[in-house]
């Protein structure tokens, strides 16, 4: 029997229904792009399903190799500590599984290009003339106490 691999998409979670919906839409689109893998998702906090539920689903489908990825822009406390703690606890509970952990999105040229394309789309859809020099794309997070984040400059 051919071994199947699973992908566990880990999100932060939010009390804002729109934020949860955006993550779920992203995860479902990703699932349609990665048809060679079983893919499930879960949130760390504030929303359901939780990460453990996604891991349960993969395990119940017979998946034994799970690649987990945090869908977060930067590596701070949640991506560095909290999600790995959930994964490690699950791994300890089910030692027959192999759970690996990827990295955060980070500053990547593809991400910057995608953001630039989105700005161009917004300019084209805007009423009236707006020059690129009059635009600004600002990404705002709640903030974090992780000292590594203060070192990031674009």
Question: What function would you assign to each model-found segment?
Answer:
Residues 1-152:
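Active-site-proximal alpha-helix that buttresses catalytic centers in soluble enzyme cores
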